Amino acid sequence: SELISALSHALDMTEGQPPGHCVRCCWIGMQLADQLGLDSDARWELYYTLLLKDLGCSSNAARICELYGTDDLSFKRDFKWVNGSLGQVVRFLLQHTGRDEGLAKSFQRLLRIVREGDHLANELIQTRCERGATIARDLGFSGAVAAGIHSLDEHWCGSGRPQGLA
């Protein structure tokens, strides 16, 4: 348990989250599990899914740097504040793409992102989710824990990624 907690804190750092983020998510999830009356097996799976939800987060770091010409930590941290509106997305991209590059290179990056943005976002999320699920299985966690980690970015309404589950 202490080892998993330490790993969870390390995942918070690699995802650009404040220390204890996954632990807080886990606490909230366990409160919901109590209210829902989940059995002990389901609670165990939920507990580890939430503590380790970001297992795959470092798998897309190099790709973020390659695509956006920026460091992945500030990119991931700051993207959490984007609400999805076009204005916020454009502002975010202008602030984070090619930060230390010349205008021409930054413009090239932005143009590619505008053209291929949805595909690139799917690629990044799919890589993260698949890698996280694989790591969970490699660590000996159940298929349910791996599936929960794989579904990290799914939304209740079907608008999430990588599969658009509802």
Segments predicted by a language model, with ranges:
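Histidine- and acidic-residue-rich, metal-dependent catalytic cores
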Residues: S1-A166
